Amino acid sequence: MQKHYWKCILYCFFVGIVISCSSTPNTTKKPQVATSKPVVSKPSQKGLEKKSDLPLTAETAIPFLQRYGAENRENKARIETPLGSFDILLFEQTLYHRANFIFLTKQNYFDGTYFHRVVTDFIIQGGNSDNYDTGQKRRKIGKYLLPPDTRNGLKHHRGVISMPSSQIENQHKLASPYEFFIVQQSPGAYHLDGNYTVFGKVIRGMDVVDAINALPTDKREWPLTNMRMRVTVLNQ
């Protein structure tokens, strides 16, 4: 009887060792570590320019924008300001101007620039600032002008977006690619037709344009309150 008793004790001891050496579920939750390489989605090449394309020049800008416009068909953007946001539609008829605006938007050029010129009951003009970063962005993107496209029948109705001429005196009315203005005057500013290129229009939020146009300005027509903007492409 005693011998049988000790056999039972030894058997239980052996079973206990075996059980203690086997794995048991851990009640503490831990993050799972994947043993396989994660799948990383590659960013779309659409809208990306080669480093060799920049900075753009008077010789390279138009061929670049022609190619860029064909590869980037977006035509809507949102402009955010301290007084609210508004949406714009860019016209297909003005190929280079549409492509240029989309290109600069994707370069984040407009972010941090201002509506720096306000003429009451006439226009608001944006795309410039007195910040160092704006000049740096322009140097990186390039020095170039856009040709006029004024024979497409588009008129300077209230709410349209147009391209101001360069400050450089030229008989061909070449436009500064970095700035734009929006007609606030009602029903329009038709005396501008034929001299400036209409390339888009406001499709939502014209009340925001009116609010910016009502801001007090200094003698240079610069708003006393900086109207910083942020521009994003809507239909990517």
Go through the PLM ranges and name each one.
Residues 2, 18-19, 23:
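Intrinsically disordered, low-complexity Ser/Thr- and Pro-rich stretches
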Residues 9-18:
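Bacterial N-terminal signal peptides
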Residues 1-10:
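Bacterial N-terminal signal peptides that target proteins for export
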Residues 21-236:
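Cyclophilin-like peptidyl-prolyl cis-trans isomerases
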